[in-house]
From Swiss-Prot:
The keyword Cytoplasm applies. It comes from Pectobacterium carotovorum subsp. carotovorum. Forms a cylinder of 14 subunits composed of two heptameric rings stacked back-to-back. Interacts with the co-chaperonin GroES. Transmembrane segments: none annotated. GO terms for molecular function: ATP binding; ATP-dependent protein folding chaperone; isomerase activity. This is Chaperonin GroEL. The gene is groEL.
Length: 540
């Protein structure tokens, strides 16, 4: 086992604080409308330019191992805030630095670290309740656009695009961000359920100008098996032909004689048919077939549950207003499934999302919810260069996460004002002893730090602005972009309650642990291996 280097008491805390300050100082230059960019060098390719706190934090490793421990613990704050709310990483880092700095001063002055931590925790619990009380629901498109704009560094086009996407696909719909090919941002919306499987034969195409199959009010046959024998399908085909409607077949595969017969029927105009493979593989395919069945009011023909294709009737088939199939995708528009059944299925999948452990599974389940509940919107980010593209895409993703958080828990006044108001309301909060009271004061003083940092980045004097804001009440604050005082809600400067709450909770959690640190242990640096001397008896 390698030898260890151990530091105690103040020595350890001073080193740790130095690491915290290096990381936090690098991150906090990005805060606010006048925050600056940080350039990150990469081992290959062009440097990355970013204004995203967590991206900066992730890049920082310090040479001194004790300082690095401090930096890594604050990096954890930014990562946790990013995971929970998708934004607010810089705010969380600034809060953590402020609590640690003030807390360690109190420890150096002889306060009991455990009582300080209890005081900080008590203040944060009370502050979260106050934030919830200040929060107002974020339901209209204008508020959603404002939240997106602020999170995307005052880029109004991004805010409007996110609001439009949410309008189109609903609050539950999936909105994804991709790199576009042009200079302009674009929004693509797919209404209805779309999955990535195209037609099995180009002979099904009935719209040659678009290269697509478009069927109006078709029946939809869902089969969890390979279909190669046409005899199995004859009863269904005859029933559909009598009804005079088209048929879409979604099966594990349709091949051989069965596919050839369907093509011939289509070309002769006996019955309009199109066949596609079922989406997904294995268990996910079974689940997605069941989703389509719920959406269209049909039944999945599966031998596992004793249903045979030969015995299928029109009652087993789903229906939709329209189905569009092209080379790579199939879109089912306005399925005729019962609303109650669809909502039940959505609730069931949501439960699976809660229980899912991997991010990949969660993402796939969320996509299924969106396909059932509304639709899918894709924001394609446009930019002139690769470097700008990466920076802009990160901003749009942050803005999207912030708007989701706002819809979930509401919004409070932005620009650090909400935390200043909360601190003022909790000024009379007390605890069991004097050391805990100092802990409460440490937390309340730290709540001013985001406002002060925003002002500092805008080139103004933080103390003057902080005092002016404290002299006002409600949503009165300072707009750093225009250097005006006024109502933050009227200015359109809103922060999602969830983002502010998460930032405070994670910052206090890690800061409280760091304040109570008394000893730090790390590996001693390995010395260079000694040179081997010349072998005996050999001339030099």
């Amino acid at each position: 086992m390698a030898a260890k280097d151990v530091k105690f008491g103040n020595d350890a805390r001073v080193k740790m604080l130095r690491g915290v300050n290096v990381l936090a100082d690098a991150v906090k230059v990005t805060l606010g409308p006048k925050g600056r960019n940080v350039v990150l060098d990469k081992s290959f390719g062009a440097p990355t330019i970013t204004k995203d706190g967590v991206s900066v934090a992730r890049e920082i490793e310090l040479e001194d191992k004790f300082e690095n421990m401090g930096a890594q613990m604050v990096k954890e704050v930014a990562s946790k805030a990013n995971d929970a709310a998708g934004d607010g990483t810089t705010t969380a880092t600034v809060l953590a630095q402020a609590i640690i700095t003030e807390g360690l001063k109190a420890v150096a002055a002889g306060m009991n670290p455990m009582d300080l931590k209890r005081g900080i925790d008590k203040a944060v619990i009370a502050a979260v309740e106050e934030l919830k009380a200040l929060s107002v629901p974020c339901s209209d498109s204008k508020a959603i656009a404002q939240v997106g704009t602020i999170s995307a560094n005052s880029d109004e086009t991004v805010g409007k695009m996110i609001a439009e996407a949410m309008d189109k696909v609903g609050k539950e719909g999936v909105i994804t961000v991709e790199e576009g090919t042009g200079l302009q941002d674009e929004l693509d919306v797919v209404e209805g359920m779309q999955f990535d499987r195209g037609y099995l034969s180009p002979y099904f195409i009935n719209k040659p100008e678009t290269g697509a199959v478009e069927l109006e009010s078709p029946f939809i046959l869902l089969a969890d098996k390979k279909i190669s024998n046409i005899r199995e399908m004859l009863p269904v085909l005859e029933a559909v032909a009598k009804a005079g409607k088209p048929l879409v077949i979604v099966a594990e595969d349709v091949e051989g004689e069965a596919l050839a017969t369907l093509v011939v029927n289509t070309m002769r105009g006996i019955v309009k048919v199109a066949a596609v493979k079922a989406p997904g593989f294995g268990d996910r395919r079974k689940a997605m077939l069941q989703d389509i069945a719920t959406l269209t009011g049909g039944t999945v023909i599966s031998e596992e549950i004793g249903l045979e294709l030969e015995k299928a009737t029109l009652e087993d088939l789903g229906q939709a207003k329209r189905v569009v199939i092209n080379k790579d995708t199939t879109t089912i528009i306005d399925g005729t499934g019962e609303e109650a059944a669809i909502q039940g299925r959505v609730a069931q999948i949501r439960q699976q999302v809660e229980e899912a452990t991997s991010d990949y599974d969660k993402e796939k389940l969320q996509e299924r919810v969106a396909k059932l509940a509304g639709g899918v919107a894709v924001i394609k980010v446009g930019a002139a260069t690769e470097v700008e593209m990466k920076e802009k895409k990160a901003r749009v993703e942050d803005a999207l996460a912030a708007t989701r958080a706002a819809v979930e828990e509401g919004v409070v006044a932005g620009g650090g004002v909400a935390l200043v108001r909360v601190a003022a309301k909790l000024a009379s909060l007390t605890a069991q002893n004097e050391d805990q009271n100092v802990g409460i004061k440490v937390a309340l003083r730290a709540m001013e730090a985001p406002l002060r940092q925003i002002v500092s980045n805008a080139g103004e004097e933080p103390s003057v602005v902080a005092n002016n804001v404290k002299a006002g009440d409600g949503n009165y604050g300072y707009n750093a972009a225009t250097e005006e005082y006024g109502n933050m809600i009227d200015f359109g400067i809103l922060d999602p309650t969830k983002v502010t709450r998460s930032a405070l909770q994670f910052a206090a959690s890690v800061a409280g642990l760091m304040i109570t640190t008394e000893c730090m242990v790390t590996d001693l640096p390995k010395g260079d291996a000694p040179d081997l001397g010349g072998a005996g008896g050999m001339g030099g």
